[in-house]
Amino acid sequence: MLKKRVEEALNAQINAEIWSAHFFLAISLHFAENGYPGFAARMKYQHQEEHRHALRLMDYVIEQGGKVELQDIMDIPSDFGDPVESFEQVLVHLMRITD
C-alpha cells in the first residue's frame, strides 16, 4: 500500500505527463495542419512517449494498491506560431517539466 503523500505525488506526476502528452499532440497537429510533416511526426512521437510515462505510473499506482486520480486537462495552447516560435514553446515546456 502506498503512503498517502507518495500516492499524491505520483498522481501529480501522472497528471503532468498527461498534460505534457496533450501539449505535444496539439503542437503535432499544428505542424501537420501547416505543412510540416516531419516536425509533426516528431511531436507525435513525443506525445506517445509522455503518454507511455503516464500509463507506466498508473500501472504502478494500481499495482501498489493505490488510486489514480485524473484531473481535467486545461490550458493547452492552441496558437503556436511559426516553426521557430513553436519550438521556443517546446523548449520552455521541456525546461519546466525537467526542472
Language-model segment annotations:
Residues 1-99:
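Iron-associated oxidoreductase/ferritin-like identity signal
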